[in-house]
């Protein structure tokens, strides 16, 4: 079974309409920045350089994760930090921005776009994570689409 948008298991009802805030949040143009921490923050020590990325940076990253592969959030954060010459990537904005990417992609799926044509957020959001539980796609949909991408 293909985990298409209409076959979501426990997915929440979607209102992919013009009123959805996610495409607008995705479209906001902001620059990434690297800041120096003047106190410990979210497990990152004072004096460390911290990347505050953007939704687009996360969307670009997830688009590069190959079909059938997944990445843990920690790996995503570490790779983005290295790429932007920082010690770490902000864990708080990582969750916020990955949710924006996921919900904007979900709106596209709901409007008929093929999974192959959206940012494949399911490859970096673990179905058992707290973030997954907030998504309209639902945790079962994430499990189903991940399973569908695995070789048989």
Where are these regions (language model features)?
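Nucleic acid-binding interface residues in structured DNA/RNA-binding domains
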Residues: 16-21, 29-33, 37-152
């Amino acid at each position: 079974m293909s985990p298409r948008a209409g076959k979501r298991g426990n997915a929440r009802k979607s209102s992919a309409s013009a009123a959805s805030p996610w495409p607008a949040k995705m479209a906001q143009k902001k620059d990434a920045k690297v800041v120096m921490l003047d106190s410990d923050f979210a497990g990152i020590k004072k004096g460390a350089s911290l990347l505050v990325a953007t939704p687009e940076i996360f969307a670009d990253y997830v688009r590069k994760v190959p079909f059938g592969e997944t990445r843990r959030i920690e790996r995503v954060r570490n790779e983005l930090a290295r790429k932007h010459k920082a010690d770490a990537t902000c864990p708080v904005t990582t969750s916020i921005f990955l949710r924006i990417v996921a919900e904007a992609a979900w709106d596209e799926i709901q409007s008929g776009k093929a999974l192959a044509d959206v940012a494949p957020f399911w490859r970096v959001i673990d179905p058992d994570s707290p973030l997954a539980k907030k998504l309209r796609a639902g945790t079962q949909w994430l499990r189903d689409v991940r399973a569908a991408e695995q070789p048989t």
